[in-house]
């Protein structure tokens, strides 16, 4: 999947034809379902960028990217040689704690690339731009500062974004990396999270349940059971 110009994408007015255009530009393997509020939020973002900088059409983002197997999704990612800018889009009011939690989680997933990370959320209904500070707080953001970072002269990543985010980067062994495991610095695939939810649901109904499953080393068996150990032991 390639980065695209969100300026070009937002010139289109029809969400059906927009999905076709997005696939053509990004090389995505499937047609992305783009909802009307997403289109309107992105248009509002582009208008704000246009009022603070020139050549918005040259900006390239990975749009609505989901990490394979893990299912983690990002609205907009600009990836350069030395920095990553993440912009999340919201159409309505969202609590600052929810914004903070999402941006912190996003930053953690992105940190495997070893580049500086700038994290923003744009709430289109309020025309409000906020950022995650280095101290993990939410603060009002400056459009000029964001545009300056977006126009930084370092090269954009031109390759397939899937090549950067391999699921293996997020695997942690509780045996060889116990400190990171205890800090919960690991990630579960969507299938693993589903299994985990089923186990916790049954245990909350009746604690006298038995679960047995097998798997090869490195398949996340310990990570799946960790919340149950914490909550019920």
Region spans (language model):
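Accessory nucleic-acid engagement/destabilization modules that flank
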Residues: 1-167
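Conserved phosphate-coordination/catalytic loops
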Residues: 97-100, 186-193, 223
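Short, well-ordered amphipathic alpha-helices
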Residues: 104-107, 198-199, 229
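N-terminal pre-P-loop "Q-motif" helix
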Residues: 166, 170, 184-209
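Short glycine/proline-rich turn/loop motifs
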Residues: 174-182
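Walker A/P-loop nucleotide-binding motif
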Residues: 210-223
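Hydrophobic positions on the alpha1 helix immediately C-terminal to the Walker A/P-loop
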Residues: 224, 228
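Post-Walker A helix-loop "phosphate-sensing" segment adjacent to the P-loop in P-loop NTPases
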Residues: 231-233
């Amino acid at each position: 999947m390639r980065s695209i110009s969100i300026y070009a994408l937002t010139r289109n007015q029809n969400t059906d034809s927009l999905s076709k255009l997005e696939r053509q530009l990004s090389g995505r393997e499937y047609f992305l379902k783009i909802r009307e509020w997403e289109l309107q939020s992105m248009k509002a973002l582009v208008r704000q960028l246009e009022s603070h900088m020139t050549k918005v059409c040259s900006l390239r983002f990975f749009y609505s990217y989901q990490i394979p197997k893990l299912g983690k999704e990002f609205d907009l990612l600009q990836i350069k040689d030395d920095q990553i800018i993440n912009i999340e889009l919201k159409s309505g009011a969202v609590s600052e704690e929810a914004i903070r939690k999402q941006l912190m989680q996003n930053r953690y997933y992105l940190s495997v690339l070893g580049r500086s990370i700038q994290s923003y959320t744009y709430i289109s209904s309020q025309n409000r731009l906020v950022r995650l500070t280095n101290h993990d707080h939410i603060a009002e953001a400056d459009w000029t500062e964001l545009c300056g970072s977006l126009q930084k002269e370092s090269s954009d990543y031109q390759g397939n974004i899937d090549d950067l985010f391999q699921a293996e980067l997020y695997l942690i062994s509780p045996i060889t990396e116990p400190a990171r495991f205890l800090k919960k610095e690991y990630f579960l695939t969507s299938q693993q999270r589903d299994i985990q939810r089923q186990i916790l649901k049954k245990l909350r109904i009746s604690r006298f349940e038995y679960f047995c499953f097998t798997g090869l080393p490195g398949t996340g068996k310990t990570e799946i059971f960790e919340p149950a150990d914490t909550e019920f032991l």
